[in-house]
Amino acid sequence: METMKATVFHSANNIRVEEVPRPSAGVGEAVIKITLTTICGTDLHILRGEYAVKPGLVIGHEPVGVIEELGEGLTGYKIGDRVLVGAITPCGQCRACLSAQWAQCGHGEGVEAIGGWRFGNTINGAQAEYLLVPNAQANLAKIPMN
């Protein structure tokens, strides 16, 4: 199993850079090699324990990177493309997404009130060497090389 370095939340005021399994892309997903990422106020709230984040989760949600791996079903992207990964990660299929209210995405679970922020909140985030992007068709934007 390949590994990577990632910033992992353990508890309030306890995050560590650790070796974790490197993700691989499934259908509709992409793996991005992170080249730039930020730390924002939300990350500081997580660090202080002000948001309920599951211990063991990789934090971070504002990355830029290069497509390393593409799962089946994605069009318009290729390995090596520079991309921005959206901080809001809509599923594209729930009631909110179908109404163009992506920030209220229920991730296909019918719970629209939880909103579309998933990276570093409910799934592994971007403070890592690689990021698995679900529903990549809706969650990536190409960045011109020049």
Question: What kind of feature is each model-predicted range?
Answer:
Residues 11-13, 26:
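Residue-level recognition of beta-strand termini and adjacent short loop/turns
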Residues 43:
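Active-site phosphate-binding/coordination module
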Residues 93-146:
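NAD(P)H dinucleotide-binding glycine-rich loop of Rossmann-like/cofactor-binding domains
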Residues 21-37, 47-98, 103, 123-124, ...:
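Glycine-rich beta-strand-centered segment in the early N-terminal region that forms part
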